[in-house]
Regions:
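Short, flexible, mixed-charge acidic loops at enzyme active sites
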Residues: 10-13, 110-115, 168-175
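Phosphate-coordinating loops and pocket residues in cytosolic domains that bind phosphorylated ligands
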Residues: 15, 26, 110, 123, ...
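Short beta-loop-alpha junction of Rossmann-like oxidoreductase domains
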Residues: 90, 101-113, 166
Length: 195
């Protein structure tokens, strides 16, 4: 579950409503802690079981417009590590997070520039963006015995986006933009054309 009232209300990161931020953290990260805590107290997960949450690269890198959801995802990943140690030592329960490619979701629909981000990630990723279905298939492996020794990790499922600096496809897009700027530079005598 992930949701930010600040994003939904169009609040920028430098103008957060702190009550909304508290709700963002509670819904998008602390709820994960609560669920694991209850499962542990009730002994609801078998030995060598697995818990997986979805994160996003904005937990570690600045992505303009992702807003306070980046803070929530960073907290989510920290919870996975901290509880991963405790639950792992007790019952060998594995806890991981998966950072997925930008994917159109209800929660993501409020993120400023999501369509542009998806296009950028597609151009940057050697394998292209991973679909929601691809992500579901990947997460299934984390519930299998094939990943019995994988825990406390944030695992990237993003077509290679997280390891890229610049791709040829993305550079070509920038070159087109730069050529456009060169041709039209006289239209904006006082700057770069941003209003």
């Amino acid at each position: 579950i992930g949701m930010s009232p600040n994003v939904r209300k169009g609040r920028t990161y430098d103008d957060l409503d702190y009550d909304y931020l508290s709700k963002t953290l509670d819904i998008s990260a602390i709820s994960f802690h609560k669920a694991i805590q209850v499962a542990r107290r009730k002994d609801a997960i078998n030995d060598w079981g697995s818990i997986v949450a979805l994160s996003y690269i904005a937990a570690q890198r600045t992505l303009y417009g992702y807003n306070d959801m980046a803070d929530a995802k960073a907290l989510l990943e920290s919870i996975a590590r901290s509880f991963g140690y405790i639950y792992g030592r007790e019952k060998h329960v594995r806890i991981n997070t998966v950072s997925q490619s930008p994917t159109p979701t209800t929660a993501g629909s409020g993120v400023l520039g999501l369509g542009d981000l998806m296009e950028f990630a597609e151009n940057m990723s050697p394998l292209g963006n991973a679909s929601a279905e691809d992500c579901a298939d990947y997460v299934l492996t984390l519930f299998s015995d094939l990943t019995r020794k994988v825990t406390m990790q944030n695992l990237y499922h993003d077509g290679g986006f997280s390891s890229m600096g610049m791709s040829r496809r993305a550079m070509k897009t920038y070159e087109k933009g730069l050529r456009f700027d060169d041709v039209h530079q006289n239209q904006y005598p006082f700057g770069d054309g941003e209003k």
